[in-house]
Structure formats: structure tokens, C-alpha cells
Design a protein with these regions (language model features):
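Catalytic cores of DNA base-excision repair glycosylases
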Residues: 3-198, 202-207, 211
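Intrinsically disordered, low-complexity, charged terminal extensions of DNA damage-control enzymes
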Residues: 1-24, 28, 187-337
Length: 337
């Protein structure tokens, strides 16, 4: 009797699955806290980028209790460079909720009540933590499903179709290993470019294997990102200290430290500033930001809330990648602890 696609994939995974720091061996018990941290970090971020951050984070916060009790700025400091800082704040809040209620969520309804957890993260967490029959979908899975069934319409138009086919394929007896297996298939074999179709365990089922446009599947047609212009200011006092401010706890880059900046090119200070003729470009999820860099040397404190700190002490404060790029553009290196 012919094996099912899920069984074939599980056999392939047993021999070829990736060794990742948040994974256990096939069939072993999984720590739900470990999965929770990894799932938050993996939202919109590649496995390769996450691994070093995950290792440092787990060393600093080995238990959910230690994370729940932590100061948010300590968490931000470990998150620096990973981006999407709202995830760090949401993970902290979720850890506090779980510790307070005394249990990890074991149903989709329970998981969706937690901050920062949507339907895809909920499915991954439940499947990987408790081997529950949830359908896991990430970028790798979307690519595999679209190619397997030759789905060429824009992803936004066929989301429900992708989810239905992914659910149909999911192994109900071993959803945890199946989830890891299909994600690994996309990461190792059914890659965005140069997919290795000849050694794919699902080759005989794939409706796109002979396509000349395989690398264009899935169809990720999107509108071009809106561009915004602005100015950022590196302000020094007579001692050479640099002025920093802290963002509010809501919105873009919330809770992080930064150099004063504005989303327009109108000067925001009454004192004289110098245009360095340098600028940086940073891409966010929905727009691209171009910032011109200005410097100033002043005697008094600027007309906004903030503080002067010695440049070498900048490493003590959580800064976004955007602000580090600004500093490095002028000073070559951002201080490290």
C-alpha cells in the first residue's frame, strides 16, 4: 500500500530534520516555555537570525518565572538587533499572564487570549508544545503548499485555500513532528531559489515540479512600500556626551531609546544644527524611512525630555537597529558592553 504524503515526509524528517536549539529529538517531551520564546522570536524573522538571540535569551531567562519577573529594559537589551520590539513586550506580558494563571494554554481559545499570539503562533505553539492536531503555517509552509498544488494566484487571494490544503495534509497522529517536518522541507529543499526537486520526498506529488516559473511560486505580489523622509539629530554637550530620549510604550519602536528625530525635514530645535550630508535608509514592514543626519554642539539641555550620556555608555540602553545605523554612519562603530 502506498504511503501517505505525511508519512513519507515524517520518514524524511527523521533522517534529515534540522537540529535547532528549541527542538527535542523526535518523540521526546518538549518544554512549552522554550517553544513560546522561539515562536515569538521567529515571527517575521529567519531561523538563522534567531538562533544566537535565542541562546542568549534562554541563558539569561531559563524559566518562564525568571522572564515574568524581569525588567522590560533587560529584555529589550537582549532583543536589540532582532527587530519588531513589540514582540519582546508581548512575550513579557504573556509570560506574566501564564505565571499568574499557573498553566500554559492548551486550547486555541486559551492561546489567543494571550498578548502577541495570533492564530498562526497559537497553532505552532500548541502543535509543537503538546502535539495537538493544529495546522502550522509559516512562510516555508506557504511556499511548499503553493508549489505542491501549483497555486499561482497572489497569496492574499488564496489564504483560505492554502490553509485548507495545509490542514488536509497535517498528520493527526504526530502533528508536532509533522509541523517541524514541513517547515524543514521548505527551508532545506523547497527553497525560494534553486529548489532541490530531485531529492524532494514529495516530488511525485508535486504539481509544479516541471514548471519553468517555480521560483515565482508562491505569488507574493504586493504594493511598493511608501517612502517617508525625516531628520535625526546627534546632539553633543561640551563634555562630548550625546543626547538620547526614550520612546513611549506604545507604537513604533516603543520603549526604546533613540536620538531625537522627526518624520519631516523641518528643524525641530531652535539652536543651530549642521547637516552632515549623510543619510540612512531603513525598511519597516509597511514603509521605508530615509533620515538625513544632523549634528549639534550645545551648552544647554534641548527643549525635549531626555538625557546626556557618555557615548561609551550607549550600550547600556536598548536602541533599535535604525538608531544604531544612524550612529554608525557618523562614528563607524556603536559601543558594545
Amino acid at each position: 500500500m502506498q504511503q501517505s504524503p505525511s508519512k513519507i515526509l515524517l520518514n524524511w524528517y527523521a533522517e534529515n530534520g534540522r537540529r535547532l536549539p528549541w527542538r527535542t529529538k523526535t518523540g521526546e517531551h518538549t518544554n512549552p516555555y522554550v517553544i513560546l520564546v522561539s515562536e515569538f522570536m521567529l515571527q517575521q524573522t529567519t531561523v538563522k537570525s534567531v538562533i544566537p538571540y535565542f541562546k542568549r535569551f534562554m541563558q539569561r531567562f531559563p524559566t518562564i518565572e525568571s522572564l515574568a519577573q524581569a525588567d522590560i529594559e533587560d529584555i529589550y537589551a537582549l532583543w536589540q538587533g532582532l527587530g519588531y520590539y513589540t514582540r519582546a513586550r508581548s512575550l513579557h506580558s504573556t509570560a506574566q499572564t501564564i505565571v499568574s494563571q499557573g498553566f500554559f494554554p492548551k486550547t486555541r481559545a486559551e492561546a489567543l487570549k494571550l498578548k502577541g499570539i495570533g492564530k498562526y503562533t497559537a497553532a505552532s505553539f500548541l502543535a509543537l508544545s503538546f502535539n495537538l492536531p493544529e495546522t502550522v503555517i509559516d512562510g516555508n509552509v506557504i511556499r511548499v503548499i503553493c508549489r505542491l498544488y501549483n497555486l499561482t494566484s497572489p497569496i492574499k487571494e488564496i489564504e483560505k485555500q492554502i490553509e485548507a490544503k495545509a490542514e488536509f495534509l497535517t498528520d493527526r497522529k504526530n502533528p508536532a513532528d509533522y509541523a517541524s517536518a514541513i517547515m524543514d522541507l521548505g527551508a532545506l529543499i523547497c527553497t525560494p531559489k534553486n529548489p532541490q526537486c530531485l531529492i524532494c520526498p514529495w516530488q511525485k506529488f508535486c504539481l509544479s515540479k516541471n514548471s519553468t516559473n517555480l521560483e515565482k511560486i508562491p505569488n507574493r505580489s504586493t504594493l511598493s512600500k511608501k517612502e517617508k523622509q525625516g531628520c535625526v539629530y546627534l546632539i553633543y554637550n561640551k563634555k562630548g556626551d550625546i543626547f538620547i530620549t526614550k520612546r513611549k510604550e506604545k507604537g513604533l519602536l516603543s520603549g526604546l531609546y533613540e536620538f531625537p528625530w522627526s518624520e519631516n525635514e523641518t528643524p525641530i530645535f531652535s539652536f543651530e544644527t549642521q547637516n552632515t550630508e549623510q543619510q540612512i535608509t531603513h525598511t519597516f514592514t509597511h514603509f521605508k524611512l530615509n533620515l538625513k543626519i544632523y549634528t549639534a554642539h550645545i551648552s544647554n539641555i534641548p527643549e525635549i525630555n531626555g538625557q546626556f550620556v557618555p557615548p561609551l555608555e550607549l550600550a547600556k540602553y536598548p536602541f533599535s537597529t535604525l538608531m544604531k545605523k544612524v550612529y554608525i554612519k557618523i562614528n563607524k562603530n556603536f559601543p558594545t558592553q
